[in-house]
């Protein structure tokens, strides 16, 4: 009896740290001071502290976070399997892909993971075991993980082999592959969850925009992992700012200043392609630089509040500290000034340097007040119009899976996030173009650039688009010299 009662608890404790990172909780920033929600005139969040996750999903599905469509029924049947079970395929078995798969299984719907793909078999096997452990922790039926050996695919073409075995596909491979994977999923008629960013260059952005239009035509739900659009404290905050709570927005300040991310050293026997694929964060054809891969979250919030995209950008950046042989070609800091059509500005900072001040947030200044942090709105006199306590809010990483799978299970077409995600990706890429070149970069020029970062051929023996010199160093962008358009 003792073992039956306490073994599940011990398992949970043993996996607590791993699970927090896997499911995205470790990425949710903490407020430095306790805040209380005191905005009484908008009912959607008046009782937020009393809501559980399922109740929140019901309410937030009517809010303006992701691109929510008027509900319409899907043509024919809701999903291709012709049963009550929603089959899910996972493409990209890293930490975020694994976390998304677990959250899909926890969505409250009859979801079964039926196929997996990754460039590397060890990543796939590790992901499979982590998902299995999470199912045990949450006491879910073991048959939710139904991936036979013949449905475990590796290599560059694994994504194509996953698609016949699923109704919904989770796309979480490195961002450089996202346009190709998304276009194939839409062509195959699959509902999609895909991680941000959705491209690393302008041709990729255009491919995603075209696939987004096709997904709309086919009534395929698409949710993108810009999870702030599914986060309680952001939903009401942005709604009030859009309604003019601080007047006209004059400036936005958005930040992702942190110590950086993982790095994988070159191993004996690796081809150059395998090394770059393993260490993908540090190569633009795979990642797009951290202004794109990470800072897109904050840039997207700026666009969301403004309900617009910038028309031009200029800035500066460089590679001052993080400049080892395994740090590829990306910068360690960027500062960009974006301008919108109405003349307002968004000032953007992102930095990956250990030992520096940590700041990951967004703030806005208006003609009659300010929004100094997510969930807080002040009048010019200092009166707090909004002060939201986020401690009991649902995990937005879970919410985005809940709403997607609820729509699919109910046969509804409700979510079309891809177009906005492509345009916020282009916002980030404009910033990179500006810092790499030292030039003013305009939206139309960036969108129509023909400069592709992707390799001509994807194979383990093929050369990647950027190669090291004899000393093992990669070419680094030089402002005033580097061409970006």
Where do the protein language model's features map onto the residues?
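N-terminal Rossmann-like dinucleotide-binding module
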Residues: 63-142, 231, 302, 483-485
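C-terminal helical cap and adjacent loop that interface with cofactors, partners, or active-site loops
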Residues: 59-63, 67-68, 99, 293, ...
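N-terminal secretory signal peptides
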Residues: 5-7, 14-18, 28-51
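N-terminal secretory signal peptides and thylakoid transit peptides that target proteins
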Residues: 48-64
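Beta-strand-loop-alpha-helix segment that lines the small-molecule cofactor/substrate pocket
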Residues: 179-230, 244
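A structured beta-alpha segment of the ubiquitous adenosine-cofactor-binding alpha/beta core
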Residues: 135-171
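Predominantly a Rossmann-like dinucleotide-binding segment in NAD(P)-dependent oxidoreductases
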Residues: 92-97, 217-224, 228-328, 338, ...
């Amino acid at each position: 009896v003792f073992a039956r009662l306490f073994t599940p608890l011990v398992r949970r404790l043993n996996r607590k740290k791993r699970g927090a990172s896997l499911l995205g909780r470790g990425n949710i920033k903490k407020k430095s001071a306790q805040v209380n929600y005191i905005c009484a005139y908008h009912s959607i969040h008046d009782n937020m502290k009393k809501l559980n996750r399922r109740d929140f999903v019901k309410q937030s599905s009517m809010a303006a976070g992701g691109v929510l469509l008027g509900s319409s029924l899907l043509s024919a049947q809701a999903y291709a399997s012709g049963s009550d079970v929603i089959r899910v395929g996972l493409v990209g078995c890293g930490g975020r892909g694994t976390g998304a798969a677990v959250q899909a299984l926890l969505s409250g719907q009859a979801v079964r993971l039926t196929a997996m793909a990754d460039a590397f078999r060890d990543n796939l096997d590790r992901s499979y075991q982590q998902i299995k452990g999470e199912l045990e922790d949450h006491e879910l039926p073991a048959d939710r993980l139904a991936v036979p050996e013949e449905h475990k695919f590796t290599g560059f073409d694994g994504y194509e082999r996953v698609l016949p075995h699923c109704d919904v596909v989770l796309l979480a491979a490195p961002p450089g592959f996202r346009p190709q994977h998304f276009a194939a999923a839409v062509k195959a008629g699959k509902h999609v969850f895909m991680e941000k960013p959705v491209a690393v260059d302008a041709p990729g952005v255009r491919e995603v925009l075209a696939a987004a239009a096709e997904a709309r035509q086919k009534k395929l739900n698409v949710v993108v992992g810009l999870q702030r659009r599914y986060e309680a404290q952001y939903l009401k905050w942005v709604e009030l700012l859009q309604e003019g709570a601080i007047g006209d927005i004059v400036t936005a300040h958005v930040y992702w200043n942190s110590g950086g991310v993982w790095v994988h050293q070159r191993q004996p026997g690796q081809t150059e392609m395998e090394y770059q694929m393993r260490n993908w964060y540090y190569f633009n054809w795979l990642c797009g630089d951290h202004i794109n891969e990470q800072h897109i979250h904050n840039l997207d919030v700026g666009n969301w509040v403004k309900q617009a995209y910038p028309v031009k950008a200029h800035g500066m950046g460089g590679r001052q500290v993080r400049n080892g042989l395994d740090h590829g070609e990306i910068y360690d800091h960027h500062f960009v000034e974006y301008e919108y059509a109405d003349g307002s500005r968004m000032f953007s900072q992102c930095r990956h340097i250990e030992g520096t001040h940590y700041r990951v947030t967004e703030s806005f200044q208006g003609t009659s007040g300010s929004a100094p942090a997510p969930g807080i709105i002040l009048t010019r006199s200092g009166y707090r119009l909004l002060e939201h306590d986020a401690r009991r809010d649902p995990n937005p990483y879970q919410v985005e899976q809940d709403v997607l799978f609820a729509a699919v299970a109910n046969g509804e077409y409700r979510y079309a996030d891809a177009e906005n995600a492509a345009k916020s990706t282009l916002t980030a890429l404009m910033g990179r173009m500006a810092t790499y070149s030292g030039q003013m970069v305009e939206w139309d020029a960036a969108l129509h650039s023909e400069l592709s970062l992707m390799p001509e051929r994807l194979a383990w023996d093929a050369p990647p688009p950027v190669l090291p010199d004899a000393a093992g160093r990669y070419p680094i962008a030089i402002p005033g010299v580097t061409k970006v358009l």
